[in-house]
Amino acid sequence: MILNAKITSADIFIEDHGVLTFMIGIETSAGWSTNIGGFYLDWTDKEGNRVPAPYTSTVVRAILETVGVRGWSDLVGKYIRIDDNDIYNSPITKIANLMKDNWINIRDFMEE
């Protein structure tokens, strides 16, 4: 189902186990709240160093451009459209600008 949603939080952070990730909190027009994200933005190389995943800058930029903002902190308070995949408890990966038909599937960037 396609729903409108307000972005309530937007964070890029290092999880407890050392992985760089992002989380975007939303409140939907259906009355429920959830988070979008949790994908790895980095991993460990052969030498044991944390290095950016090849898609990191691409996915961050795609999210910013889709929502229509220039900075990650500017996401908060913006409205988007989401596709909940019509599956209960399925992660939200498809977002679009509220006024434009420019959908992205965040998961697609992770599979490149």
Please provide the spans of the model-predicted regions:
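Short beta-rich binding modules
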Residues: M1-E112
